[in-house]
């Protein structure tokens, strides 16, 4: 009960600090909100449940399972150890040895073996703690050197931030790639198919046959009954299509094949256009349906918009790391323009709408305009019935003119050639709009560089064109870049907001502005550890790594609270103890719980940081950020926080009335309960 009551309030405040840092996650928007809100909720409820169990179940189990150990909890090694105040702590090792040798049964021998391991571990740990106390005493005696070293580490770490790079989410090896192939405008479907065969042979020259699971070609427009507005395909005519290559499980990195194919295909097929789009559902969601993560939109009704888009394309293609740069829309697609003679059509009872609907049904079937179903009474299944003119009957312009035009009030069909003239011309193959305005999209992928670095240079190119735009034309960047910037702004503000919330929570708990300031002195070390871990592991700064930073801040604050709280308790219990001795005692006593808490989190995050398994690369930055932050934050908590405490708490310490009453009630501080 003494041990549980002593750390009840510090443990509760530490738990709240870990929970509070996740509160800003609930104010995020976009994709990051849906990805990380479940994680935040899971951590919050798990921490609250663990605190409840640690206050109820754990003391009960200690009462019944550690009955023989209760008289030895506050002891160390046989022969004594050097306490931080210079005294010698002696223990009676005879009773413990007798208890180890007493049982002779199988279970007793196992317990004896485990007890022996425990004794050896304690022996090593006490040696470590003795060295730590000596190192901490040196730091307390040389505060200027410690502050200078801490400041230098923070400055060096801040200088590394520009070298980290920024990404929205880390790239995931999906085991497949999606290649879009576009032949010159007007290429017939048969010719496009032949070009696809040649591209397929080039792919098999790069990717070994034993690593290819299957290759799927989708040439031309989709022919399903689903409206094209709901299709994820970016094919726009018979001159282009997609090749989806799925790889076997044990394959080389997909990015390596993609890089080689980019160079080879552009070299072997200079008259064709190639770009790789997102193959997996996660990347497609992050791109919001756009084929590439970078989308520069030229919006406006001015006909010069397409020329501006091509000029931007030429500039962006020169940026290192920008690949697959292309203008999504084509404006030179061959088509046939049908000019209806409205006077002639009106004379025989037809309208331009009747002519357009007849041609649409004849060329594209009635499946979209007038769907009809036939019920098979034998099996009860409805079958869609569509009417369409066979392609071999409209191979020439004269065949198209011979298309019969019908209407409900027309006594007999009328040939299209009698109502309209047909002429050849060029027109846009695809027309896109954004906010009702026509738009041209300049799309770009990123290779061998971070998305943020490429996006910054693209933004400079876009800014250089804004002063040259015609009236009514606008430039904007969308896609994954826009989501990344908004998520970074939200998480960055959330990180600052979390620190402020934790600080004010501790102000309320400690009834002081100084103690919370001392506690958050562990946070610079956590941020330095995060930066160094990301830099050394080659990990970019992204949304998962920022989530890891938030988690590391919560745990580092919790450990720092334990140290400062114990130092205050020591000064309450011993009125004559100065801040130097209180900080030394706090480090000596809290070494074990601080290391245990940090190691538990680090070991738990280690498998995640390795990025093992399917899609493990996506969560690896989170684990690496937590591990790096806690490694340095633990050192900062054990060395720098006591130094700051000894400096800022030099004056006479005044105990809180509740703390003093609890101290008198329980008879002082129990070191075993702290551990």
Regions found by a protein language model. Name each.
Residues 313-498, 502, 507-510, 574-585:
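Extracytoplasmic/periplasmic membrane-proximal domains and adjacent transmembrane bundles
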Residues 190-288, 293, 343-369, 373, ...:
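Solvent-exposed, membrane-proximal periplasmic/extracellular interface segments of envelope transport
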